[in-house]
Amino acid sequence: FVKEKKLDVGFAYDGDADRCIAVDENGKVIDGDLILYICGKYLMEQGRLEGNTIVTTVMSNLGLYKACDKIGMKYEQTAVGDKYVYENMLKNGYILGGEQSGHIIFSKHARTGDGILTSLLIMEVILEKKQSLGTLAGEVKIYPQLLKNVRVTDKKTARENPAVQEAVQKAAD
């Protein structure tokens, strides 16, 4: 629709509008990871990103972390769930966190995801930087990603297993 109507940006919300996914001028989906990067970088440049840190979950894409590293933006990972993201933000005084799913929390304004607030901040970034959403998102190279649950009988043993740790590190490199 965005591409067909030659719009600059589009927004999609879930049923209660606590999640927001954007669509750029080329019809590309801009998920929560990209939104975190775009908003985090903007707030950091303005000196408004507490600790220059965003809070993400373990499901975030490696490309987000590499892009953050490149610009000096820090990040903390939590378990999946906006509850855990918010707990970390509250504990450490961070103001921006979220999930790939589009749950984005701006703790100065809300304690949970707010899709309308998210879309307003995205619009602020686009207008203030005078750049398209596609250009802003283009700084992040999203890597192929497979999310798969693996059942184990003892999570602690699996996590501490050297072979598992080596495989995870190899995949991250």
Placement of each model-derived feature along the sequence:
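Phosphate-binding and adjacent anionic-ligand microenvironments
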Residues: 9, 46-173
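Anionic group-transfer/hydrolysis microenvironments
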Residues: 14-16, 26, 59, 101
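Generic structural signal for well-ordered alpha-helical scaffold segments
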Residues: 3, 41-44, 172
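Short acidic-hydrophobic sequence patches enriched in Asp/Glu that either
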Residues: 31-39, 60, 118
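N-terminal small/polar loop signature for handling phosphorylated ligands or for N-terminal nucleophile
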Residues: 1-23
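Structural motif
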Residues: 34-50
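Short, structured secondary-structure boundary patches
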Residues: 1-4, 32-34, 95-101
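Short Gly/Thr/Asp-enriched flexible loops that form oxyanion-binding sites at enzyme active sites
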Residues: 18-37
